[in-house]
A protein has these predicted regions:
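Active-site bordering "gate/hinge" segments
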Residues: 1-264
Length: 264
């Protein structure tokens, strides 16, 4: 649950009194005491490009006994701000909910708006949305693979994937001028079109990106000293995946045949 902000409905997951101030770093964290047991606190401000979060590890050597995650630093009261809309600012608020998923959030909002209005985006508009969604998905997954490599201290793949993620973001900028896809998806369709010359350039960049990504990622899986650090770490049972409603690679890794692109 969000530790540092009440929801706009005032139902506090931590059951704190309404008149109690909520301040970052004020609260009880789980602790493990013992000889050579140490605590590692990370965040909420990180050196990379990830959004803020506080992670507190209780460790013994390389064994992690307990991890507590405190989120909520990015909560800005947007749900409450959206009440009474839509208006001219609504789509811009939706696009800035999270930097990694501007296109996905904008598409979800537009699909809801179109369904309520009884209309649909044009076939070309839907195709351009689909391209932008796939580019956003690629950037996220490539970035995550690089981050995983960094987590096990395998810097070659971490560095390569960071650069390749930037190449994918630049492809999105080729479509609409924004590396995060802002301004592209709009109710009823899209805000930008793409001619044949631009699509040919996009295809050329995609081919180059695929080759680079395969080399960078296969390099990680061919390095036994890196692979061994992933073994038996973070495995999620299928039943838990169903209970949590996991989707995407996290769901498919547990054996669930889920793909929102196919299922919607």
């Amino acid at each position: 649950p969000v530790r540092y902000r009440r929801s706009w409905t005032d139902r506090d997951a931590w059951q704190r009194p309404a008149d109690e101030a909520i301040l970052p770093a004020v609260g009880d964290f789980y602790r493990v005491d013992g000889e050579q047991v140490h605590e590692v606190a990370v965040g909420p401000v990180h050196a990379g490009v990830i959004e803020p979060g506080h992670f507190r590890f209780q460790c013994y050597g390389e064994t992690v006994f307990h991890l507590e995650i405190a989120l909520g630093y990015q909560h800005r009261g947007i749900e409450e701000t959206l009440l009474g809309g839509p208006d001219a600012r609504t789509i811009h608020l939706i696009e800035t909910l999270a930097g990694d998923t501007s296109v996905a959030h904008a598409t979800a909002y537009c699909q809801v708006s179109e369904a309520l209005a009884g209309c649909a985006a044009t076939a070309r508009g839907q195709a351009l949305r689909g391209i932008a969604l796939e580019l956003e998905r690629m950037a996220t997954h490539i970035g995550d693979l690089g981050a995983l490599a960094g987590d096990v201290a395998y810097l070659p793949t971490a560095s390569f994937c960071g650069r390749i993620r930037g190449d994918v973001l630049n492809m999105t900028a080729l479509l609409c001028g924004s590396r995060f896809g802002r301004g592209l998806v709009r109710p009823g369709g899209v805000g930008f079109d793409a001619n044949a010359e631009r699509m040919a350039e996009l295809r050329r960049r995609l081919d180059a990106c695929e080759k680079d990504a395969r080399v960078a990622i296969e390099l990680l899986w061919r390095t036994s000293s890196a692979v061994v650090r992933f073994e038996e770490v973070g495995a999620v049972p299928r039943a838990i995946a169903v209970e949590l409603g996991l989707v995407g690679p996290a769901a498919r890794a547990t054996g669930l045949a889920r793909d929102i692109r196919r299922d919607q």
